[in-house]
């Protein structure tokens, strides 16, 4: 899962959206640095990552990547799940339009920015203003996201080519998304994530 899915599941679970978004920017034990609700959100994010990576649908999807891109498949798939969520948002969350949800999420996250790591602050400088969560529905933007990640971290250069794996298996990936994501939504609503 990437930014949108973590925020969505946090909302369904009535967990800290701030903590769920912040989690990838925090190493080790967050309890000394953040308030309890944010810490709980960070832990929820970490549980979701472990759960998602071990889902049979996700393990199967990783096998569809070519040898030269399989190492970055987990990252690429996280971004792709956000694509499907953004694309099908009106079906999955009909009572909370994506644009409104994005504004709501931004308001929640802004409350912790003064005490956040600089990399997280940098992310927030463009995540909201460039409308990433809405633009995830566009595959050209997904390609741009993967290229941007590869540019910032040269050891992840294979992300550029992983776009071709997504394109080659688009329909099958979408099917897998529909197989697992509604289950995760239900688990989040029951606070079981």
Swiss-Prot record:
The keyword Ribonucleoprotein does not apply. Its EC number is 3.1.4.14. GO terms for molecular function: [acyl-carrier-protein] phosphodiesterase activity. One of its GO terms (biological process) is fatty acid biosynthetic process. Keywords: Fatty acid biosynthesis, Fatty acid metabolism, Hydrolase, Lipid biosynthesis, Lipid metabolism. It catalyses: holo-[ACP] + H2O = apo-[ACP] + (R)-4'-phosphopantetheine + H(+). It comes from the Bacteria. The keyword Lipid biosynthesis applies. HAMAP family: AcpH. PANTHER family: ACYL CARRIER PROTEIN PHOSPHODIESTERASE (PTHR38764:SF1). Belongs to the AcpH family. Converts holo-ACP to apo-ACP by hydrolytic cleavage of the phosphopantetheine prosthetic group from ACP. This is Acyl carrier protein phosphodiesterase. The gene is acpH.
